[in-house]
UniProtKB/Swiss-Prot annotation:
Single GO cellular component term: bacterial nucleoid
Membrane-spanning ranges: none
Domain of life (superkingdom): Bacteria
Gene3D superfamilies, alphabetized: Nucleic acid-binding proteins, Recombination protein O, C-terminal domain
HAMAP family: RecO
Protein purpose: Involved in DNA repair and RecF pathway recombination.
Gene Ontology terms: biological process: DNA recombination; double-strand break repair
Pfam families: RecO_C, RecO_N
Name of this protein: DNA repair protein RecO
Amino acid sequence: MIRKTQAIVLRTINYGDQSKIVTFFTRSFGKLTGLVKGYRNPKGKFASVLEIGNDLDLVLYKKDTREVQLITEAVLRAPMLGATSSLEQLSALHQTLELIRLTTENDDAHLGVFELLHATLQKINVSRKNHISFFFYFQVQLISLLGFRLNFQKCVLTGKSLSEKALPKDARVVLLAEHGGFALQLAAEERGFAGMPVSTDAFKAVQWLSLVAIESVENLFLEKLVINEIFQLLDSYFRFHIDDLPAFRSREIFNQLVF
């Protein structure tokens, strides 16, 4: 059946002499793998359209019994990044695309996830600073959409507020992934839970990202130590909930160059 949908390019792999296997995240079908014939022909109709992160209108011949669908047409809606892009932009882009590819299943449509991905990529593309903050925003929001929301507002052991006003200055928090949130370190120790210690700066940052609109994220500047801590914090939570999650190759590559 011929189907049309909006799609974002997640990954491309050469196939044969002229073709590519392309992974998309689509508005209508979720993650989808397609065969694009003749893509590598410089005079072909797909030339330069299917670049990583591009926003497309896609036409495909979809057959539910096939794992790889045949792509018949792709029209560019908006390109992603350009020759003047910074390393931090490229890092945020590739990590966002890799995360969605590794944490979602084929043919599992989720409009909320698509709209989050689309909005995040747009902001990475046009914003002038703090691009990695958009990736962290994406992670925090994606966690909720995938069904394992983090509780940032109350201690998961005592119910006490973790808001900036309520949290004592000398208080420390730990991540208790098995409880779906954070706990006061003292309360965790009293109950025999070790948890993952989280600095005040890292906790405040991810808590703030869970509450704000994406338009505000560009203003969040993070020190390198806090950036690396948030990487570890959110990575740990994803891996607790998603079995056999592979290592993020884009993070290994870009973080050595940027952070």
